[in-house]
């Protein structure tokens, strides 16, 4: 009997990484992991460290597309994206990324390139290795842990969130999510109504419920994310009340006003949703998933209707806590 295989794809996107990550999510519906050599060293993953640092990466550039698949060394291995799949996506994914590069060049009038590697492993190897590597993490008051790790006896139930990162769209391990959780931890949300835009795994929606919101609406344009949110609500034994909603779609389907809105997205989507957040927000807006290079362009738009109460940064990621200006309806 043939042993089942598992495929790992490694990418480096020198420019507009968040656009490429959104494309990968929309194309594959698989979770992405942002990593670096430092992270791999922390998990003592010697095999992967050797693979990414010693292999010849393949390369595609819009300024010379005829040289596709040229093997080169990336300029650095500070940040790369890992995508894992039970299927070999090489024949479809890499050409799709190349076409996406060329479309970006045409629409943004700029050159784009990316580096990539792929390898296949026995399924039993990566599953166990991944479980051993994914450890619980504390984000302010919240203790985030996978289902295969029990919560510590001293942790309060209301502070624990169970998320399986291998199966989810987001977890507390990413800087953008952890900063959202930290900002939520400091807020008194009892008897408030909340909106989670781009709910993904549902981790922020679960945190909002644990913070005491009286009514929650969550939405995502990916049907798999909606399913994941509902699954994780059940995993955490959080009932959806009559006034709670999990919606497949964007904010255009949502009516009313919300005391707090949380949106952990990407900068381009955040900028496009400004008028919607003005329409829906009564008081506090938390934005995350913004790369430092895009922060000024986001602030230029949001200064019109919101005041910046707090700004946090972790590595290249930025999160904002905003207050809606009373003069804006």
UniProtKB/Swiss-Prot annotation:
It is found in: Cytoplasm. Keywords: Cytoplasm, Methyltransferase, S-adenosyl-L-methionine, Transferase. The keyword Oxidoreductase does not apply. S-adenosyl-L-methionine binds at residues 177, 198, 220, 264. It comes from the Bacteria. InterPro entries: Ribosomal_L11_MeTrfase_PrmA (IPR050078), Ribosomal_PrmA_MeTrfase (IPR004498), SAM-dependent_MTases_sf (IPR029063). GO terms for biological process: methylation. It is an enzyme of class 2 (transferase). GO terms for molecular function: protein-lysine N-methyltransferase activity. It catalyses: L-lysyl-[protein] + 3 S-adenosyl-L-methionine = N(6),N(6),N(6)-trimethyl-L-lysyl-[protein] + 3 S-adenosyl-L-homocysteine + 3 H(+). Gene3D superfamilies: Vaccinia Virus protein VP39. GO terms for cellular component: cytoplasm. Disulfide bonds: none annotated. Its EC number is 2.1.1.-. Its main location: cytoplasm. Methylates ribosomal protein L11. Belongs to the methyltransferase superfamily. PrmA family. This is Ribosomal protein L11 methyltransferase. The gene is prmA.
């Amino acid at each position: 009997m043939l042993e089942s295989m598992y495929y790992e794809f490694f990418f480096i996107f020198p420019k507009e990484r968040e656009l490429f990550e959104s494309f990968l999510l929309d194309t594959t519906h698989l979770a992405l992991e942002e990593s670096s050599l430092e992270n791999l060293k922390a998990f003592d993953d010697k095999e992967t460290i050797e693979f990414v640092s010693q292999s010849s990466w393949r390369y595609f550039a819009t300024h010379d597309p005829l040289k596709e698949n040229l093997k080169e060394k990336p300029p650095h291995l500070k940040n790369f994206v890992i995508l894992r799949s039970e299927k070999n996506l090489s024949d479809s994914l890499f050409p799709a990324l190349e076409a996406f590069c060329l479309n970006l060049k045409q629409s943004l009038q700029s050159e784009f390139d990316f580096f990539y590697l792929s390898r296949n492993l026995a399924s039993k190897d990566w599953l166990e290795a991944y479980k051993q590597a994914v450890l619980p993490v504390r984000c302010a008051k919240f203790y985030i842990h996978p289902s295969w790790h029990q919560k510590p006896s001293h942790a309060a139930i209301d502070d624990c969130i169970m998320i399986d990162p291998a199966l989810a769209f987001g977890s507390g391990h990413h800087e953008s999510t952890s900063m959202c959780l930290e900002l939520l931890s400091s807020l008194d949300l009892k008897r408030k109504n909340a909106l989670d835009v781009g709910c993904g795994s549902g981790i922020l929606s679960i945190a909002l419920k644990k913070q005491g919101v009286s009514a929650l609406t969550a939405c995502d344009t990916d049907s798999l994310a909606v399913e994941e949110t509902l699954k994780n609500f059940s995993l955490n034994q959080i009932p959806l009340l009559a006034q709670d909603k999990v919606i497949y779609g964007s904010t255009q389907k949502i009516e009313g006003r919300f005391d707090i809105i949380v949106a952990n997205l990407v900068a381009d989507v955040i900028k496009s949703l400004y008028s919607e957040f003005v329409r829906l927000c009564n008081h506090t807006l938390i934005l995350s998933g913004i790369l430092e290079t895009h922060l000024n362009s986001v602030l230029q738009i949001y200064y019109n209707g919101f005041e910046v109460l707090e700004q946090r940064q972790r590595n290249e990621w930025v999160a904002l806590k905003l207050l809606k200006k009373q003069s804006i309806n």
